[in-house]
């Protein structure tokens, strides 16, 4: 390589180093190859644990991760939320709620360069205060035969919305054991068989405690597919993203 006149004293190796550094500094996050983050998420202060294992693209934004978690745990996105990442809050600003320094539709997960086993927190409903702990279990290569995001494991249904938070939820678990709920549910169906519309709310509440141990991973993945295809209006469809392949 011929040494340019502006660097008369630099050897060829130093020039190459300068060129590489310049290229790396000029790379944006969109220039980096996407990977897959395997995340394990659980709700704090709940026993038995309610948890999910998700595969999420590293180029997912904070806003997209919010939507994904809402779907994975069955939340309705009716309350304020925030992420706490290394002590700094992130999230989608809402009228009358918190404001954030960074645009959640632009900040990508890979921008943080998370280490394996590193954790962050997702808080939802700042009155009931559901705290979801998120741990990066491992970083995987992108599989072109799979569609992301993808739920690969989990246990138990997400809590009832507006039930009062973890402590109240634990008390309700004791208050509604299956052997009590099943007769109540059956009796209500009999008593209101001609006007079930009048007791839909109570029936749904009782039904939750009947099936609370069940987790329908396939149903979650169907919703995630709809979300990634931009078909789910209630959970961030304007920020949807997808990958090729089926699961």
Please tell me what each predicted stretch does.
Residues 7, 11-247:
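Short linear regulatory motifs enriched in tryptophan with gly/pro/ser
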């Amino acid at each position: 390589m011929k040494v340019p006149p502006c660097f008369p004293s630099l050897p060829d190796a130093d020039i190459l180093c300068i060129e590489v550094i310049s290229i790396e500094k000029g790379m944006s996050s969109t220039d980096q190859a996407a990977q897959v983050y395997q995340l394990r998420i659980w709700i704090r202060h709940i026993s038995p644990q309610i948890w999910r294992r998700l595969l999420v693209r590293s180029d997912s934004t904070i806003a997209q991760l919010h939507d994904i978690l809402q779907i994975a745990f069955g939340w309705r996105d009716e309350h304020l939320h925030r992420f706490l990442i290394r002590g700094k809050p992130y999230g989608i600003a809402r009228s009358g709620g918190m404001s954030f320094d960074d645009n959640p539709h632009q900040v990508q997960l890979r921008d943080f360069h998370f280490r394996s086993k590193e954790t962050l927190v997702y808080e939802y409903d700042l009155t009931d205060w559901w705290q979801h702990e998120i741990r990066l279990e491992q970083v995987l290569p992108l599989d072109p035969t799979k569609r992301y995001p993808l739920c690969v494991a989990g246990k138990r249904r997400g809590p009832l919305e507006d039930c009062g938070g973890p402590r109240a939820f634990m008390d309700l678990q004791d208050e509604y054991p299956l052997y009590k709920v099943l007769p109540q549910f059956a009796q209500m169906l009999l008593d209101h068989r001609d006007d079930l519309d009048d007791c839909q709310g109570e029936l749904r509440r009782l039904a939750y405690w009947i099936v609370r141990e069940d987790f329908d991973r396939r149903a979650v993945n169907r919703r995630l597919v709809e979300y990634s295809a931009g078909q789910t209006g209630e959970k961030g469809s304007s920020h949807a993203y997808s990958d090729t392949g089926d699961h």
